[in-house]
């Protein structure tokens, strides 16, 4: 089975001393993928996203705000989200890598394509960045895949400990996008209740399963097994994109869920099986949160193992 790792050291220019969203996160996750796949891993070069594709999601005025902040030597979009010289190029690489991963998986070039990038993206909305995020990488990738005729009905799986408020807001009225999320609640950003099910024509395509602090593998796995994976199956997507955050891990310093590597492997296995059942070419992932380096490495490795095992269970003979 083919695995792609899409990562680029150019994203490391986006850094602020003492900030938890730091460059060595990328290295830890990339090492986790390499641990599992070894010499058979493909690492194609990353191509930065073009502005036209970014503007399918983000307002041009917001992009100008980012560019202006860089030109002034940097600044803060909110108390959590910084811009420094090099941040805009890092965001372009992050979105570009996520689009490459999405295309590789949707076309069958890779069974698993993991964009190991930063800054993360799922809190970024059309006109603002927040929660460490500048561009909404998964949203831009989805729009780019559609624009290139690669996929039309797309499911977004989000297991970050924080609800992906930006992603949900962008697609909640779109009936051709299914958004499924587990996240800690109550917690930042304060959205993601079970009653948030989409709006307008998109009612019924948003699925939130908030988990209380202290929840571990049992609750995490059950939410996906019993509710979210069946909802995605009923939606019948022709591509799956995963917002892979690992801050629900029990060792993460910024949250209070108790998920382990085994929990991520189990849920990834379900997604792998589902992708094979649907006849999809593969599964694409993009890095979101996660701030303990050892947990990041182990969880990324567990995710890739789970996805490959799930896909093999249906695509390879005994």
What does each of the following model-derived ranges do?
Residues 1-318:
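HDAC/HDAC-like amidohydrolase catalytic core signature
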């Amino acid at each position: 089975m083919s695995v792609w790792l899409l990562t680029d050291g150019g994203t490391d220019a986006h850094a602020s001393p003492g900030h938890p969203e730091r460059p060595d996160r990328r290295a830890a996750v990339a090492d986790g993928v390499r641990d599992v796949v070894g010499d058979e891993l493909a690492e194609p070069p990353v191509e930065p996203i073009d502005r036209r594709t970014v503007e399918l999601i983000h307002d041009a005025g917001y992009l100008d705000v980012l560019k202006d902040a860089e030109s002034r030597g940097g600044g803060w979009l909110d108390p959590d989200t910084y811009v420094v010289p090099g941040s805009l190029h890092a965001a372009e690489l992050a979105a570009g890598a996520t689009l490459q991963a999405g295309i590789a998986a949707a076309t069958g070039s890779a069974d698993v394509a993991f964009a190991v990038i930063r800054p993360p993206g799922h809190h970024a909305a059309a006109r603002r960045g927040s929660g460490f995020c500048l561009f909404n990488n998964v949203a831009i990738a989805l729009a780019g895949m559609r624009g290139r005729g690669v996929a039309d009905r797309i499911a977004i799986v989000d297991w970050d400990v924080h609800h992906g408020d930006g992603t949900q807001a962008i697609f909640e009225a779109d009936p051709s996008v299914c958004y499924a999320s587990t996240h800690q609640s109550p917690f930042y950003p304060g959205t993601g209740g079970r009653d948030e099910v989409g709006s307008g024509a998109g009612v019924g395509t948003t699925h939130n399963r908030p988990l209380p602090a202290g929840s571990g593998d049992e609750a995490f796995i059950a939410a996906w097994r019993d509710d979210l994976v069946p909802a995605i199956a009923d939606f019948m997507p022709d591509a799956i994109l995963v917002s892979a955050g690992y801050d629900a891990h029990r060792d993460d310093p910024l949250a209070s869920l108790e998920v382990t590597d085994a929990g991520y492997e189990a849920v990834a296995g379900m997604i792998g099986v589902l992708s094979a059942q649907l006849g999809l070419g593969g599964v694409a992932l993009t890095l979101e949160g996660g701030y303990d380096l050892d947990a990041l490495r182990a969880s990324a490795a567990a995710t890739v193992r789970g996805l490959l095992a799930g896909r093999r269970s249906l695509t390879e003979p005994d």
